[in-house]
């Protein structure tokens, strides 16, 4: 595939005939972004063709031009679709809803779906390389402002997660000594701005705590609330660390990025 900021183009070569001339999936068009995912006799397409927050379309493997794309999951104003993982009997959709990442598991066998639950108010989650097609096991990574990176194995049939590996933090770190919150601040124009914060338990919430506020909004880059050992010394001295998910990133969807431009 060949991609630029505002367009994509894929070319297909059969795995069984690698010398065959590549076939263009959909010719490049300015403003048309898409990614493709092969499943049996069809493709799933993640695209901004019909919605700025992206939708999921399908087409047969023999008719791949955009005029043949059929809507599978429509675009939504409050949800940005970021990626797909395709399995034999499941489809996992990576979404960003109100700034928080979510994993939606769709079951082809009974046309049902569910979301993997996460118990913290602010966190980061993403799928790993899932290279086995015919399986009910999904691997994903999770971390938050108080939890170091953890890799999970999730059974999409039983809906159970199992820890495979958790990043070790040297120095006697105890995540139970810290707390995180997600709050909303009012912008000058009345827009609600999501903010992720972390602090050490036991501080007085009287407005007098030293605070380090971080914000970055540009190029559609979302600043996720990840774990960092660098801030632990501040938290242990009574600081509150805050990430403001300001406009310019895509935390709240494509318009959040567009509205951050001057």
Predicted feature residues:
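Conserved beta-propeller blade repeats
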Residues: 24-46, 75-90, 122-141, 181, ...
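Multi-bladed beta-propeller domains
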Residues: 14-33, 60-81, 85, 109-129, ...
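Beta-strand C-termini and the immediately following turn/loop, strongest in propeller blades
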Residues: 1-4, 14, 39, 44-50, ...
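Repetitive beta-architecture junctions, highlighting loop-to-beta-strand starts
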Residues: 8-10, 20, 54, 67, ...
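Serine-hydrolase catalytic core recognition
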Residues: 125-262
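Conserved blade-register residue in beta-propeller folds
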Residues: 12, 58, 102-105, 153, ...
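C-terminal structured "cap/appendage" subdomains that terminate the fold
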Residues: 88-144, 149-152
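Beta-propeller blade termini and top-face loops
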Residues: 7-13, 55-58, 220-227
């Amino acid at each position: 595939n060949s991609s630029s900021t505002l367009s994509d183009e894929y070319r297909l070569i059969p795995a069984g005939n690698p010398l065959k001339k590549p076939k263009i999936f959909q010719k490049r068009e300015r403003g048309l972004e898409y990614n493709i995912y092969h499943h049996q006799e069809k493709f799933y397409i993640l695209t901004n063709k019909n919605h700025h927050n992206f939708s999921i379309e399908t087409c047969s493997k023999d008719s791949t031009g955009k005029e043949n794309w059929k809507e599978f999951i429509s675009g939504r104003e409050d949800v940005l679709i970021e990626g797909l993982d395709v399995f034999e009997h499941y489809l996992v959709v990576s979404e960003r809803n109100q700034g928080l990442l979510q994993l939606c598991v769709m079951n082809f066998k009974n046309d049902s779906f569910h979301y993997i639950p996460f118990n913290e108010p602010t966190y980061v989650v993403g799928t790993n390389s899932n290279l086995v097609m015919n399986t009910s096991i999904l691997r994903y990574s999770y971390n938050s402002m108080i939890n170091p990176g953890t890799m999970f194995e999730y059974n999409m049939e039983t809906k159970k997660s199992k820890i495979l590996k958790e990043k070790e933090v040297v120095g006697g770190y105890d995540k139970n000594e810290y707390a995180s919150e997600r709050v909303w601040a009012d912008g000058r124009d009345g827009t609600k701005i999501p903010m992720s914060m972390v602090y050490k338990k036991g501080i007085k919430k009287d407005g007098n705590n030293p605070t380090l506020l971080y914000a970055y909004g540009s190029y559609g880059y979302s600043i996720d609330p990840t774990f960092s050992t660098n801030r632990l010394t501040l938290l242990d001295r009574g600081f509150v660390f805050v990430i403001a998910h300001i406009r310019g990133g895509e935390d709240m969807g494509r318009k959040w990025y567009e509205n951050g431009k001057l």
